[in-house]
């Protein structure tokens, strides 16, 4: 049996550079890239070399810290202005993932009261490292809460990749499957391929197989038949942004799975950290939806599969209405139904815990 957690980390800090697992090359090639400046970091995020909301946040935090180390000035005011400009630059790399803004803003806030440039540089590194350490703990706790919703032998459908390589470790939607493996429970995962970038086919199946988790790959248009024929007991997905009312932006195709779950009468779960919940965004209507390069649809592995000049609509995300979501699973617990009241309460609980 494979070691359940023998899974490559997606991001590492190495003092003079950031090392990332190039998720664009998986599963055929396991390639690690060295990001040596802020432009490398921006490109890695925008080009999906690193992806998954928490991993994006971690990488951006390290990118901000790295750029700060490379900026030479004795003026603390000029240094902070440089950090703020870098923050805005990195924030432009992916407009939907709220973890990106959360991590960058956390680093900017961490140097609000420093007294020197050297102190600011050290603080930024420590804060970025802290974000990664905290995310690993958060993901494990999400997995423990999620696992309480499953029984031995359950067959669970997921989309995209909300796994270990999308986070610091364990993942969000995939975390319960690693913990089930650890505890000797048998859960079978059905992974939707996730067109057009194929994160489910390339990434989810790859990392689950590395850990010896039972996984079956399906194409996106097989979901309804799979739920019916394979007796799927639940759907679990990650999230890139959750609005205050529970509306959830996630990889394109998630909304369709939620509709299918409702039609078949099975639970539809969203697993995400508190940092993905954006209380300033009241509903899903306010969430910007990134539209990506048409070639992601018209080409596969560099080969054109559609006529030259065809019109293409390529949204990277869709928004699942809150009334289709059975529960939102966070590190602080499971929220069901009354999201406008219960989601803010999670943050109040977090604030009380930090004050103790």
Swiss-Prot record:
Family under the similarity heading: Belongs to the eIF-2B alpha/beta/delta subunits family. MtnA subfamily.
Pathway membership: Amino-acid biosynthesis; L-methionine biosynthesis via salvage pathway; L-methionine from S-methyl-5-thio-alpha-D-ribose 1-phosphate: step 1/6
Listed InterPro entries: IF-2B-related (IPR000649), IF-M1Pi (IPR005251), IF_2B-like_C (IPR042529), Initiation_fac_2B_a/b/d (IPR011559), M1Pi_N (IPR027363), NagB/RpiA_transferase-like (IPR037171)
Site keyed Transition state stabilizer: positions: 160
Name of the protein in question: Methylthioribose-1-phosphate isomerase
Positions annotated as active site in the UniProt record: 240 (proton donor)
Domain of life from the UniProt record: Bacteria
Protein's UniProt keywords contain Secreted: no
Function text: Catalyzes the interconversion of methylthioribose-1-phosphate (MTR-1-P) into methylthioribulose-1-phosphate (MTRu-1-P).
A GO molecular-function annotation: S-methyl-5-thioribose-1-phosphate isomerase activity
Catalytic activity annotation: 5-(methylsulfanyl)-alpha-D-ribose 1-phosphate = 5-(methylsulfanyl)-D-ribulose 1-phosphate
Oligomer status and interactors: Homodimer.
GO biological process, one term: L-methionine salvage from methylthioadenosine
Pfam families: IF-2B
